């Protein structure tokens, strides 16, 4: 086993030991996916309400201080529902290149917000963070939530390669997906991680066969470990 895997296995062992104590605060990750899967329907005549309902449990990931992608997309759906429908249809079209459709979604939202009033439109909140969230909620066995600072710390601790800081944000997002693919693969190898979920999941929580939600949770777990080590 190489050094990279040794480091990853070390932190996975620690994550396993800490999982139970973190569960109540972190289970929103699995709930966010299931809520989205149960409610998302682009044919719904009330598009803003549908988006609001579908992303209700992802609010923690999508709205916080000075960052309002959820509020922004709901607001734009009220103003231009047909355009927003088309944007999501293209974003979720797996026949198209991932990088191209992610950039197209972000740029379309940026153009659409011009002329809109309110704090949600002062800047383009439909960044790769937001785009990755939509992709993950729609295809939880393929994608992940992306945040550069989290990915950077995971890479630092596990020594799994990650994009250069100067690369375009979409490249960083895709690089993070690749990194978390490696982590989810390790999680699937051991029954003990699956057992942790099976003992806790109910109908309100996504089953997570691919262990992508758990890989995300592992990434969130790594971040405070990294920050404590720098104090």
Spans of features found by a protein language model:
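An N-terminal alpha-helical hairpin/helix-loop-helix interaction module that forms a charged
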Residues: 1-124, 140-231
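Cytochrome P450 catalytic-core helices
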Residues: 131-135
């Amino acid at each position: 086993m190489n050094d990279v895997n040794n480091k990853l296995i070390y932190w996975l062992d620690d994550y396993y030991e800490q999982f139970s104590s973190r569960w109540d605060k972190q289970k929103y990750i699995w709930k966010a996916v299931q809520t989205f899967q149960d409610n998302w329907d682009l044919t719904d005549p009330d598009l803003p309400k549908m988006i609001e309902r579908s992303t209700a449990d992802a609010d923690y990931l999508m709205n916080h201080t000075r960052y309002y992608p959820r509020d922004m997309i709901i607001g734009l759906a009220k103003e231009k529902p047909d355009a927003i429908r088309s944007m999501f249809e293209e974003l979720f079209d797996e026949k198209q290149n991932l990088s191209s459709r992610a950039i197209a979604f972000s740029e379309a939202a940026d153009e659409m917000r011009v002329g809109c009033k309110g704090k949600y439109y002062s800047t383009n909140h439909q960044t790769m963070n937001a785009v990755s969230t939509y992709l993950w909620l729609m295809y939880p066995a393929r994608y992940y939530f992306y945040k550069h600072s989290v990915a950077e710390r995971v890479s630092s601790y596990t020594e799994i390669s990650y994009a250069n800081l100067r690369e375009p944000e979409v490249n960083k997002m895709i690089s993070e997906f690749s990194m978390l693919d490696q982590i989810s693969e390790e999680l699937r190898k051991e029954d003990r991680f699956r057992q942790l979920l099976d003992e806790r999941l109910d109908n309100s929580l996504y089953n997570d066969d691919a262990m992508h939600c758990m890989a995300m949770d592992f990434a969130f777990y790594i971040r405070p470990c990294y920050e404590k080590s720098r104090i």
